[in-house]
Regions:
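Outer-membrane beta-barrel porins/channels
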Residues: 1-24, 69, 89-249
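Outer-membrane beta-barrel translocator/receptor signature
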Residues: 32-111
């Protein structure tokens, strides 16, 4: 889960696709190659595992964040599941990995109250806008790596991305003669992601090896469904309206 106003935009906070060994080195991943650690960021690294090794890895993140606006301070403690994956030798020159990891997370709740004007009897009218969002996208992946040469490997990951994201805005006024409203936007995503990886190893001696890595992700429009809901009310009377869509690009 998360609690950040920045997740209001786009698909939310994009998850770090790196595993523990990558996070420990500041997020580098494309060149990492280790027979005892999974590197799902570059599928070419899957060939590093030997025939007697089966890897299973899981991780989570704990976060402590402080937000400040003017004199208002807020502390948020979040925990999130990061990944679950396994890797094994598929063939003499081929390795494989499968796993599950988040793609993005959305979670926020904030409000703002402002003074608009005074009505006929001099009463101040306040407007309160409340913003909330939750949800996120998950991804399941499977990938293979193939050792073309002793020092050159290639690989590919295919991922299925799915999930729902909801954003809502509620506007309320302090007087009874003004319309209040709520607007809800929800998107549901079901799509794929395809990544290609390459790794080249240059061996200086028995102890020192320099690894080069590169990854290319196939770009395409995101497919999904959108749902919109709008409602206004005044003195107990509701005036709802809905609208549905088919494609999000």
């Amino acid at each position: 889960s998360t609690n950040s106003p920045y997740t209001r935009y786009g698909f939310g906070s994009l998850a770090d696709q790196g595993f523990g060994n990558s996070k420990a080195m500041g997020g580098i991943a494309y060149g990492l190659r280790n027979g005892y650690q999974i590197n799902a960021s570059n599928p070419a690294s899957y060939t590093a595992v030997d025939s007697l090794t089966f890897l299973f890895d899981a991780g989570m993140t704990l976060q402590n964040a402080n937000f400040k606006e003017g004199n208002i301070k807020t502390n948020a403690k979040n925990s999130s599941f990061d990944y679950l994956a396994m890797q094994f030798r598929l063939w003499k020159r081929m390795g494989m990995a499968v796993g599950f990891l988040p793609f993005s997370t959305v979670g926020y709740s904030l409000s703002n109250t402002s003074e608009l004007t005074k009505d006929e009897d001099g009463t101040v009218i306040n407007k309160t806008a409340s913003y909330a969002g939750d949800g996120g996208l998950q991804q399941v992946f499977a990938g293979v790596g193939f050792k073309v040469l002793d020092n050159l490997s290639i690989g590919a990951n295919i991922s299925y991305i799915y999930g729902d994201i909801t954003h809502s805005v509620t506007t309320a006024f302090s007087n009874s003669s003004s319309f209040s409203s709520v607007r809800l936007d929800k998107i549901s995503i079901n799509d794929y992601k395809l990544d290609f990886g390459l790794q080249y190893s240059y061996k200086f001696n028995k102890k020192h090896v320099l690894n080069f890595g590169a990854v290319y992700s196939l770009g395409h429009s995101v497919n999904g469904k959108g749902y919109k809901y709008n409602q206004k009310w005044l003195n107990g009377a509701d005036y709802p309206s809905t609208q549905t869509g088919d494609t999000i690009t």
